[in-house]
Design a protein with these regions (language model features):
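A conserved active-site cap/scaffold subdomain adjacent to cofactor or substrate pockets
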Residues: 198-199, 205-260
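N-terminal active-site segment of His-dependent metallophosphoesterases
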Residues: 1-68, 75, 359-370
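Divalent metal-coordination and catalytic microenvironments
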Residues: 8, 28, 43, 48, ...
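His/Asp/Glu-rich metal-coordinating catalytic cores
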Residues: 55, 82-208, 212-219
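Short, conserved loop/helix-junction motifs that constitute active-site signature segments
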Residues: 72-74, 162-164, 199-203, 281-284, ...
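Short, well-ordered beta-strand micro-motif
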Residues: 116-118, 245-247, 292
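Accessory, non-catalytic peripheral segments of nucleic-acid enzymes
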Residues: 37, 248-377
Length: 377
């Protein structure tokens, strides 16, 4: 059979405060079209359907439309697991109902082991993001203390359910040993329980992973991250985004890129080079920008000036950070003796070219006082 492997949709996510629902809607329409173009038999979503465990109404509406389009309108079986950003309990609501339309949403270890999904020549095991306590409870073994042991027990139990006449695919959401991550996954998110050694997954013919946003995060021929369909942080600016098309018999793997509605673009140059209508005209106004300046002198109100040309700046830095901060240099003794509020005020002025307002100054005083009290116990 042939299926499409995608993951880490993060519906409702914002990119440094900028809403992404329009970009996500466009990406899902394109995924839907790819599924039609490649005549897939099923669609796999390997976790993190939502960006938050309690998503916004707009995010829920968007995901519902996308799932209905794929499952009810196009008729593709959907195989999905909950990720660490999802609420397993909320996603599980309606599970029995979904199953009647070939929408399989697994949110527990018990489901992953006891309810493999057979479609055509393939048996799918759908393993959600899990905590060690859930695995201890399932096996009745309090000695399971790390992810490697937990996964070894889970995979061994899954093997007992293998149909020898079928291909076996694991759909999961975790951090695999040897993977690299990007800034849109924090250490706690990717590290969570530590890592799963790749060799533990050897019994499976293919492992469709979610959790990391880079398709190249792991170099294993049959263990793949799909990555996210959009760029979700400055560190992802050069990453390819797309989906895997997987054929089971004979096995074949094809990467198909997705063209974003609005791209995340990195610009490097001096302020005078970048802050012109001519330079900005090479890009869509609604693109997202990571800007790296080569200037060394301070530029008052820098961000606002750049946003006149590039409204959606998500990150701003200098090529020469040491030179950038040279105008802020002061003897260590002077810094130690200076009032924290004065330091903050100086920094704010250097960055924005403006003075703190009365409200900002009062907020800073309150925050500094609270921090001091907490430090003193």
């Amino acid at each position: 059979m042939r299926f499409l492997h995608t993951a880490d949709w993060h519906v409702g996510k914002k990119l440094n405060g900028f809403d992404l629902l329009a970009e996500q809607h466009d990406a899902f329409l394109k995924i839907n079209q790819l599924a039609k173009d490649y005549k897939v038999d099923a669609v796999v979503v390997a976790g993190d359907l939502y960006d938050r465990s309690v998503p916004s109404e707009e995010a829920v509406e968007e995901l519902n439309k996308d799932l209905i389009r794929m499952n009810l309108k196009e008729g593709w079986p959907l195989l999905a697991v909950s990720g660490n950003h999802d609420s397993a309990v909320r996603l599980a609501t309606g599970g029995a109902w979904f199953k009647a339309t070939n929408f399989f949403m697994h949110t527990t270890v018990a489901q992953a082991i006891e309810e493999p999904v057979t479609l055509g020549d393939t048996q799918f095991f759908l393993l959600p993001f899990f905590g060690l306590q859930e695995v201890r409870n399932y096996f009745g073994d309090p000695e399971i203390r790390d992810l490697k042991t937990a996964m070894a027990r889970i995979v061994a139990k899954m093997e007992e359910e293998f149909d020898p006449d079928r291909t076996h695919v694991l759909v999961a959401h975790f951090f695999a040993a040897g993977s690299s991550h990007t800034d849109s996954e924090t250490q706690t998110e990717v590290g969570g329980l530590d890592a799963v050694p790749v060799d533990l997954m050897a019994p499976f013919d293919y492992v469709a992973l979610g959790h990391l946003h880079n398709k190249n995060a792991l170099q294993a021929p049959r263990v793949k991250y799909a990555g996210s369909p959009l760029k979700f942080s400055a560190s992802e600016v050069n990453l390819d985004k797309g989906v895997w098309i997987v054929d089971t018999q004979p096995f074949n793997l094809q990467w198909v890129p997705l063209e974003p509605l609005h791209d995340l673009v990195k610009l490097t140059g001096s302020f005078d080079e970048l802050a012109t209508v001519e330079y900005a005209s090479h890009y869509q106004e609604d693109d997202f920008f990571v800007i790296e300046l080569t200037d060394t002198a301070p530029i008052p109100d820098l961000m606002n000036k750049l946003r006149h040309y590039y409204p959606k700046i998500i990150a701003l830095s200098r090529v020469n950070k040491a030179a950038d901060q040279s105008h802020l240099a002061a003897p260590a003794q002077d810094l130690e003796n200076k009032d924290p509020l004065a330091l903050l005020s100086d920094f704010y002025h250097q960055v924005t070219g403006e003075e703190l307002s009365d409200n900002q100054r009062q907020w800073a005083k309150d925050a500094l006082l609270a921090a001091q009290k907490e430090e003193e116990g």
